[in-house]
Amino acid sequence: MRRLLSALVSILLLLCLCLVPLGIPAVAAELPPVKHLDTPIDVNNTILRNYRQLPGFYPTLARILVKNAPYNSLEDMLQIPELTEQQKALIKANAENFVFGEYQEGANQLENRINQGYYG
């Protein structure tokens, strides 16, 4: 009887394992909704915090964009090697929210563009 019960449990376990999918298919995550800004972000001279206005940018993508500025065009932004396909899609979807002002070298040091030091 004990052997029969053990065999039935083993068969049941084997059936359960066969019926459970071994992998979950990858599903592309949906992009956050695009928000239209009244005043576009000057990607060459802005600070990290300004990207908080755009869903999906702050802090990771915003940091990448600030660190790799200046850009001449949207295509320049999309050439950053560390961008994922989803991040590129997010940048393209928000293209109307960016302007490419003339880079003001020395006006905003990189560490100040990343951390303005607001601790209050």
UniProtKB/Swiss-Prot annotation:
Keyword terms of this UniProt record: Electron transport, Membrane, Photosynthesis, Photosystem II, Signal, Thylakoid, Transport
Lipid bilayer topology: Peripheral membrane protein
Signal sequence range: 1-28
Keyword Signal: yes
Source species, domain of life: Bacteria
Cellular component aspect of the GO annotation: extrinsic component of membrane; photosystem II oxygen evolving complex; plasma membrane-derived thylakoid membrane
Localization, UniProt: Cellular thylakoid membrane
Location (main, coarse): membrane
Example GO BP: photosystem II stabilization
Pfam families: PsbU
HAMAP family, A to Z: PSII_PsbU
Family stated for the protein in its record: Belongs to the PsbU family.
Subunit structure of this chain's protein: PSII is composed of 1 copy each of membrane proteins PsbA, PsbB, PsbC, PsbD, PsbE, PsbF, PsbH, PsbI, PsbJ, PsbK, PsbL, PsbM, PsbT, PsbX, PsbY, PsbZ, Psb30/Ycf12, peripheral proteins PsbO, CyanoQ (PsbQ), PsbU, PsbV and a large number of cofactors. It forms dimeric complexes.
Function as written in the Swiss-Prot or TrEMBL entry: One of the extrinsic, lumenal subunits of photosystem II (PSII). PSII is a light-driven water plastoquinone oxidoreductase, using light energy to abstract electrons from H(2)O, generating a proton gradient subsequently used for ATP formation. The extrinsic proteins stabilize the structure of photosystem II oxygen-evolving complex (OEC), the ion environment of oxygen evolution and protect the OEC against heat-induced inactivation.
Name assigned to this protein: Photosystem II extrinsic protein U
Organism: Synechococcus sp. (strain JA-3-3Ab)
Top-level taxonomy: Bacteria, Bacillati, Cyanobacteriota, Cyanophyceae, Synechococcales
Gene assigned in the entry: psbU
